[in-house]
Amino acid sequence: MMSEKYALVTGGSSGIGAAICKSLLEDGYQVVSLSRRASGAGSHGLHEVQVDLADALATREAAHEVMSRFPITTLIHNAGAIREKPLEEVSLEDLQALTNLHLSAALSLMQAALPTMKQKHFGRVVLVSTRAVLGLANRTVYSSTKAGMLGLARTWALELGAHGITVNVVAPGPIEATEMFHEIIPVDSPKLPRIVDSIPVKRLGRPEDVARAVRFFVSPDAGFVTGQTLFVCGGTSVGSIVY
């Protein structure tokens, strides 16, 4: 039944996260969105919880509160930040903040959700990483902490497969209409045409492109796919991208 499908999405208030929430709602899920700010969407079936996921203690508390209220069996950790800096300017605080956001939050949320997933012998976990794990200048803390998601997914896939739980990664390339992309490349930037020309499919991605990949991984029919990384990047993972 529709009411029995519960998903948690981090960073669900805008961009890729909002597109993922919309897709899940259309598929009949009750969706809990964890974000720093509310979307204001007011969609039926959407439950919004405001939390700073870079705050490890607040994240753990929010995770346990959500899991006590909702039987979450689908978890999508999408929230992220970049902190673009050359190597000389990267601080340990930058590294710790993005480690908390990208990796510690994933761990806290997964540990909180695991009892329900194991009890139901079903779970779908998607970690939203980035094409930048293959290397991109001035992304030291972003690339390294997002790359850690691939290690989490492969390890958890081995540990949890016998419990009916799959864990996969979606790694987007340049996605328009997202704060993270346009923080680096404004919509009126003269660099934009050059970036598009460097993408094999000759366009930027859209949030819906990523949501469709997530939709595949969370399907009950995807139970034989786990520990995998799907690049949703217009082909830049097999070539390069110019910023």
Model-derived segments and spans:
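Catalytic loop of short-chain dehydrogenase/reductase
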Residues: V126-G148, A153-A162, P174
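Conserved glycine-rich cofactor-binding loop
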Residues: S13-S14
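Conserved NAD(P)H cofactor-binding loop of Rossmann-fold oxidoreductase domains
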Residues: N78-E84, G235
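Substrate-binding pocket helix/loop in short-chain dehydrogenase/reductase
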Residues: P86-L87, D94-T99, K191, I195
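A glycine/serine/threonine-rich, flexible loop-to-helix segment
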Residues: H44, A162, I175-I199, G239-Y243
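Alpha-helical segment proximal to the catalytic Tyr-Lys
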Residues: P115, L158-A162, G223
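Short C-terminal tail/terminal secondary-structure segment
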Residues: R215, T226-Y243
